[in-house]
Amino acid sequence: EGGAPFPPEARRGDAWTGFKRGWRDVSMQVAQGRAVTPFLQGKAVGGSTPINGAIIHRMPQRIHAAWADRHGLGETLPYDALDGIFDRLDDELSVEPTPEAAWGGNNSRFKQGADALGWTSNPTRRAVDGCERTARCNQGCAAALKQSMDQTYIPRVIQEGARLYSECRVERIIEASGRA
């Protein structure tokens, strides 16, 4: 991983400290093109997952189809094979629609407006196991309820024998005898 571990107990400080610890360039990166666009990138163990909103979307079929045409993804991983993978990830990461009790005023009003206009709306699906609504998702969940990679899969693979190197920059991966 490019950054250092950012354990939940270190996520209790102010926003500035959270941004310095969790975000590459203190969340001030931009991608330049026709427009300058903020480009947020995590730098802690777990990448961006410790400091994002834990929003989980399933890959739309139209995106898969485009990647299948452009990059040959369809031959390697057909779209219908993804359903079981998505279901397993949802189960392992506690992905479910955000409960109404956690919406807050803005989201509740948005839902009321959508209903009044006859629009269909759905709560965002998030990987959180019992959100406490601290509103610190982008600084890192101090309660360790967000199912980020540093809280879920990384400890699991370490327990199974993987080694984690933090604060390292990977320039290439050498594979030999089935190991990287």
Question: What feature does the model see in each segment?
Answer:
Residues 1-67, 79-80:
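N-terminal glycine-rich phosphate/pyrophosphate-binding loop and immediately adjacent elements
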Residues 9-17, 125-128, 142-145:
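A broad, low-specificity signal for short, low-complexity segments enriched in glycine/proline
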Residues 21-24, 122, 146:
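Acidic, His- and aromatic-enriched active-site or binding-groove loops in soluble protein domains
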Residues 27-28, 52, 98-99, 141-142:
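A generic structural signal for short
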Residues 37, 108, 151-152:
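Residue-level marker for well-ordered alpha-helical positions
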Residues 42-131:
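Rossmann-like flavin
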Residues 113-116, 127, 132-180:
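Helical element adjacent to the flavin cofactor pocket in flavoenzyme catalytic cores
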